[in-house]
């Protein structure tokens, strides 16, 4: 097997069945990091293993979609926002149809600052990225909810006029879509939006 077929965490060789399940049969770690939620329980050394593995993949194929996303998510989780933006920007350039690039770049673009204290230019840039993600992946409600949370925290909390669609309209539009509560919660946490926010994933009792 090639290097790309080795678990980044334990070095175990995996087969197509394990890849379909996205889980190493030996250590049960995710083989591909496609969501920041996969990194929730990993410490820095474990995340560095994913970075090392995907760096090797990118040396052979600089436009590998999975590796670019994984690198962006690992650096995002580590709070290294400039590096996260670099790889997510490369992902968007190489795969402009991939909604995840826009979604995570929007989150990282605030550099760990709460939307309420960000600049208007930063908010507008994040909004545009999230609107693009909604267009590309309309069935995934995470884009709608995170955009609603950003607009509520910046515009409403600062007493400013709210652009359309409003946070309420965005939440209503997310009904019936796929909602991953953990994924949404991780996204809000990376933007320092408090758990007391009306857009806390605890509001979404059912995943669809």
Predicted regions and their residues:
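Long, contiguous interaction/recruitment modules in multidomain scaffold/adaptor proteins
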Residues: 1-49
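Short coil turns that delineate tetratricopeptide repeat
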Residues: 19, 62, 96, 138, ...
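Short coil/turn linking the two alpha-helices of tandem helical-hairpin repeats
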Residues: 79, 106, 110-118, 148, ...
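Terminal, low-structured helical/coil segments at or just beyond the last alpha-helical repeat
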Residues: 157, 163-208
